[in-house]
Amino acid sequence: MDTLASLYTKHLATLQQRARTILERHQLDGLLIHSGEPIARFLDDQDYPFKINPYFKAWVPVTQVPNCWLWIDGVNKPKLWFYSPLDYWHSVSPLPQAFWTEQVEMTAQRHADDIAALLPAARGNVAYIGPNAERARSLGIDEAHQNPQAVLNFLHYHRAYKSEYEQACMREAQKIAVDGHQAALEAFRAGMSEFDINLAYLSATGQGENDVPYDNIIALNRHAAVLHYTHLERRAPSEMHSFLIDAGAEFHGYAADLTRTYAANGQSDFAALVAEVNQAQQALIATLQTGVRYTDYNLQFHQRLAAILRHHHILTGISDEAAVAQGLTTPFLPHGLGHPLGLQVHDVAGFMQDELGTQMAAPDRYPYLRCTRIMEPGMVMTIEPGLYFIDTLLAPWLEGEFGQHFNRGRIDALRPYGGIRIEDNVIFHAHGVENMTRDLHLA
């Protein structure tokens, strides 16, 4: 098996080839990639938690250090100016010595403003990739070369194809997240609050709330009906009905994004509903293959969802086909089936059909679907169907043209549980799909 170091060498060669292509196409001398800068809180002497430029961590696994720079010409070793000030007020990251450092030409940068003197003098024909336009201007980068859209389109599009190194990092992120999910489930079964369940998760992963790739969703009971619930109640509810956890982890800048839902009473109707959504998700994953547009799989799950809703008498007096055709499944599943995953949780280019940036929007019926691409080898996607009882979405349907098909009694009985989401992370390969999450036996 290849080591992470050897996989990184191949990964870097791929990035260099992409850089050569885009530099030649637009007659540029190089890419100047900025890790980013701290952002100060208003009227405060503290900064917001730092989040690095995803294009920086694509080249080097540096994820928490601001004021760093990469110079890429596609031919020579990437030049890395690593910010390492002499500072007794704050902890300072030392110059890295790791599996990847021999592949770059690294120099310590003691002051953030030193970069102007360290960079090559000729910078008029360089593309700046980063978050700070003012800094780019101060370095003499023309506005037209600051995050040029044509360059970003090319880079975004090809980010969908994960190298073997990236896939290996994402498998490691899965392992960390699975440890957290198992600890969180134990905390739920022990009757802990959302706040304490989250602490158990973070402790098990060894990652702080600013290290995980997104704010953890730890939702008990009705809170599971809020798709991005992040409030974290300090007290446990007097009665436990359900637990939805959507929480991830990072490894070398690459994300895992996993969701599970549990019933407090394993013999309840809600537990049976969770089991059926889980089975439907696994059945859909068994059909995944390259060469199929992701929108087709989204529609396929709505067909499966209609069958579940009818089986549990939540929808009545209508066929599966008619329920989907008339949109009756949409208030129960308002989000899309999933999204690209990688350097960012909602990774870029889900709608891009080519490297020029041609877009295909989500279908009108499913406007929150985050991907319309044809699946190809190397793509990493989440598969995260759900079934929710959201008052604001159900109300117009209950009173509308098709209201007679919605079983109010069943819906009212299930409202206290909030909802269900089951999410796995999969890699598309030429001859099949790898479910990284289930391979680690996360039930």
UniProtKB/Swiss-Prot annotation:
It is an enzyme of class 3 (hydrolase). Mn(2+) 1 binds at residues 257, 339, 384, 423. Keywords: Dipeptidase, Hydrolase, Manganese, Metal-binding, Metalloprotease, Protease. It comes from the Bacteria. GO terms for molecular function: aminopeptidase activity; metal ion binding; metalloexopeptidase activity; phosphoric triester hydrolase activity; proline dipeptidase activity. SUPFAM superfamilies: Creatinase/aminopeptidase. Its EC number is 3.4.13.9. The keyword Hydrolase applies. Splits dipeptides with a prolyl residue in the C-terminal position. Belongs to the peptidase M24B family. Bacterial-type prolidase subfamily. This is Xaa-Pro dipeptidase. It comes from Edwardsiella ictaluri (strain 93-146).
